[in-house]
A protein has these predicted regions:
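Selective recognition of hydrophobic, aromatic-rich stretches within alpha-helical transmembrane segments
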Residues: 41, 75-107, 149-186, 248-285
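Extracellular/periplasmic helix-loop-helix junctions in multi-pass membrane proteins
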Residues: 149-153, 219-261
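Interfacial aromatic "cap" segments that immediately flank transmembrane helices
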Residues: 2-38, 113-136, 169-217, 268-271, ...
Length: 292
């Protein structure tokens, strides 16, 4: 049984899925665009989009925004922002459950693969636990870094770099909680730490390679979507509609459909990395052709 996997094969595994299961990938992309549309509609309807637009304008000004200015804009919008992010997290859990069932067990259950089952519930709880653990770790590391900085400025700079590296290492070690939650029936955080043991650089390389592709292609597609929306009479601007009336245009519909579907494929690619690594590490797939 192979105990390792190829980072490059894992990074490009979504293309293999697209070749074998094009209908599933298309459904996932369309549902992702739908989730983006719902998220943007909630942001626009609750006033959160307008607040973020005003904050973006403030942040781009020549002078550094004061804490009072930031609070005056974002403070009243915090309930709306929290509600919008909560809706997005819940809907994303459904999409993730759909993708993990398919990539790990080749199963599609429910409407278009969507199901409100234990996988979705565990993933949502695990996501909250992941955010909590990362937040605590960031606070502890930040506190230690600040103490070191008070001793010597040069040591403080090195400590900042070390803390960034530590957070990347820790976050990546826990990043497979979705995959491990499905295969073990648990939250998957501890199991993720075990799964990534000795494979950090392989996971890092796979995610970094796919991230570079996402940045390049995402920039191109977003530009095309923005130009297309502008041709239809809609100026996208910051990427968020200020209100529901502004969102209810053909231009925004075109932007969300194109960019949302492509973003869905990008997100599916990140999930495929974990699933592919799991299968290849177990020997379910042919062993890596190379170490790269």
């Amino acid at each position: 049984m192979s105990k390792t996997f190829s980072p490059s094969e894992a990074a490009f595994s979504v293309f293999e899925l697209m070749k074998r299961q094009p209908q599933f990938v298309m459904r996932y992309a369309m549902l992702s665009a739908g989730v983006m549309a719902i998220y943007m509609f909630v942001m626009a309807s609750t006033g959160a989009g307008d607040a973020l637009q005003r904050y973006a304008v403030l942040a781009q000004s020549e002078q550094m925004p004061t804490m009072e200015q930031v609070q005056s804009i974002l403070g009243p919008a915090m309930p709306s922002l929290f509600f919008s992010f909560l809706i997005s997290a819940i809907l994303s859990a459904f999409l993730t459950g759909m993708a993990l069932r398919k990539t790990l067990h080749d199963r599609e259950e429910g409407f278009w693969g969507l199901q409100a089952g234990p996988i979705e519930g565990r993933f949502l709880l695990a996501t909250l636990a992941f955010v909590a653990v990362i937040s605590v770790a960031a606070f502890v590391i930040g506190f230690i870094t600040s103490l070191i900085a008070t001793i010597h400025m040069a040591l403080g700079s090195l400590a900042i770099l070390a803390s960034i590296g530590a957070m990347i290492w820790f976050g990546l070690r826990l990043s497979q909680f979705g995959v491990m939650g499905v295969v073990t029936g648990k939250l998957g955080l501890r199991e993720s730490f075990e799964q990534t043991n000795g494979k950090f650089w392989r996971y890092f390389g796979a995610y970094l390679l796919w991230l570079v592709i996402v940045i390049i292609l995402g920039t191109i597609v977003q530009g095309l979507a923005t130009i297309g929306a502008l041709a239809l009479g809609t100026k996208i601007g910051s990427g968020l509609p200020a209100n529901a009336q502004e969102f209810a245009t053909v231009g925004w519909a075109f932007y969300v459909l194109l960019y949302g579907m492509v973003t869905g494929v990008f997100n599916l690619g990140f999930l495929c990395i974990g699933a592919y690594a799991w299968h290849q590490s177990r020997g379910d797939l042919p062993p890596p052709k190379s170490d790269l």
